[in-house]
Amino acid sequence: MLPRVIALLTGLGLCALAQAKPTQYPLTVENCGSTLTFAQAPARSVTIGQAATEMLYALGVGDKVVGTSLWFNNVLPPFKALNDNIERLANNEPSFESVIAKRPQLVAAELEWVVGPQGVVGTREQFHELKIATYLLPSDCEGKDNRVGADGTRLEPFRVDTIYKSIRQLAEIFDVQDRGQQLNDELKARLAKSVATVHSKGLKQASALVWFSSAEMASDPYVAGHKGVPEFMLQTLGLRNVVQSDEEWPAVGWETIAKANPTVLVIARMDRRRYPADDHEQKLAFLRSDPVTRNMDAVKHNRIIILDAMALQASVRTFEGLEQLATAIDGYDLPK
């Protein structure tokens, strides 16, 4: 594995030297079942979902964003000044009216349940009838059925290539292909670095659980299923997910989790406060006091890793989350 990682890093350095071609308009893009045509780069965009927002910021087109919404964490520090000057339409889901009031030429959405067939903000057709293009991040529609389960059900395992595809397509839409290529190269290098960090651990027996949130502290937690982004992160670093549901974030009882006795617990940190368990401090207090959870090995040995919620979603933060997860795992004495 390690020689391949080194080869990948070397290859990325060479790839960065090649320049991408400028966009030829009109541009046609196939996106999550819709065919989009752009006569020119969008001058005004609204984002619904932090992953879409920070992806546009990372591509250097934040000056084209006129409204944001659906936040889990504070914006990445390098983008704070930029983000402070852009209107936040809502902390959670915005209204359809508030989005179209910004007169966007493009709505970039992270999740199909906000803009899709049963979109809580609106359907793609509603926006398209107003000549507003909609772009959905492929990570939430490819290999996934969002009609099944509270947060959708994966028909096939999440592929990290869908993140690279989002970046590549958005870069083409906004005519910033060089930056898109550079960003993808940077993210691939971070992925390779994370794998190299835990390479010597040779993990085969270690397991993990990823706890996102809970509607109530005492209710069944929303945890990562075995085909989503967290599963990709765990598998990449040699950990086995104790949850085998195809749902994105199924609710699983603590008794079932305790019986599986994961080696490591990963908990999401959020700045939003929709549910009590959005607060990671409350998560920690619960784990250490509840009679069922406090006897799990991960709790007794303090093998609890805190990651930003957005690192557990398909986003540019996924790779930072992988680095943090790899560093934490490298510091543990885990079964091999």
Placement of each model-derived feature along the sequence:
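Short helices/loops that flank or line small-molecule/ion binding pockets
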Residues: 96-103, 121, 252-261
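Bacterial Sec-exported substrate-binding components of ABC uptake systems
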Residues: 5, 9, 18-54, 156, ...
